Amino acid sequence: MSVEKAKAYWQLMRMDRPIGTLLLLWPTLWALIIAAEGTPDWHVLLVFVLGVVLMRSAGCVINDFADRKVDGHVKRTQQRPLPSGRVTAKEAVILFLLLGISSFLLVLTMNPLTIQLSFAGIVLAFIYPFMKRYTHLPQLFLGLAFSWAIPMAWAAQANELPWVVWFVFAINALWTIAYDTQYAMVDRDDDIQIGVKSTAILFGRHDKLIIGLLQLLTLVMLVWLGLHYQLGQSFYWSVLAAGALFVYQQHLIRHRQRELCFQAFLNNNYVGMVLALGLFVAFW
């Protein structure tokens, strides 16, 4: 394999842009910390950190495969490996399968409940990229896909799925819809021209308001989570910090400028991080 081909595969997996991996990792860590009520099992932690990297990479590959015929018409994505011809569709499918199989082999070291849940995770990762052709709610499907690691991680750590798992699942799904709508605002004009659907298009001039409402609901549910577990001040400080970051994001997107909407999207990494730190300290 040539250096150029390896570089193309690396870019296809978005290894040069880790934001998606981080946004998937933080809620996974939330689940592990809460399920363990502190420090999770090291084997489980290692499996899920590696699994997040592999599955996010697999998701990027299948996403670019699904979008290979439209990415060439979008300024931001024209130079991706598939539309630029540096990777073929067949090579992308093979890479997706290799990443998916590698992830499943990791899951096989977990308990039966986690293994059973993994099948739904694979389905969600596969179907999400195609949803933008059929519905204005692909961000909802991303929310489901990016939240599925939560019940899996919880099951791996505690071997059970109490109802609060799905509450945390809902928190993350709402947050994901909010930040992926910010991301969709970057490409909205191009998406309208080529017929791709998104919540940014669906929400229209109400986009900032709806993002704000989703963020507010996320914060309210986080406070309830803290009350349920009787968490200390460190967690509420982290929720307050997340709220401040949401306010900053609203400031960034106020004029709907592409670059600033993208910066708002990237800023969500800090939201996930401060909440993970708050949970860790609270359960310590």
UniProtKB/Swiss-Prot annotation:
Family: Belongs to the UbiA prenyltransferase family.
Annotated function: Catalyzes the prenylation of para-hydroxybenzoate (PHB) with an all-trans polyprenyl group. Mediates the second step in the final reaction sequence of ubiquinone-8 (UQ-8) biosynthesis, which is the condensation of the polyisoprenoid side chain with PHB, generating the first membrane-bound Q intermediate 3-octaprenyl-4-hydroxybenzoate.
Enzymatic class: transferase
Pathway field: Cofactor biosynthesis; ubiquinone biosynthesis
Protein name per the record: 4-hydroxybenzoate octaprenyltransferase
Gene that specifies this protein: ubiA
Species per Swiss-Prot/TrEMBL record: Vibrio vulnificus (strain YJ016)
Cellular component annotations (GO), alphabetically ordered: plasma membrane
Membrane topology: Multi-pass membrane protein
EC number: 2.5.1.39
Keyword Cell inner membrane: yes
Pfam families reported in the protein's UniProt record: UbiA
Catalytic activity: all-trans-octaprenyl diphosphate + 4-hydroxybenzoate = 4-hydroxy-3-(all-trans-octaprenyl)benzoate + diphosphate
Alphabetized NCBIfam families for the sequence: ubiA_proteo
Subcellular location: Cell inner membrane
Alphabetized CDD domains for the sequence: PT_UbiA_COQ2
Keyword Cell inner membrane: yes
GO molecular function: 4-hydroxybenzoate polyprenyltransferase activity
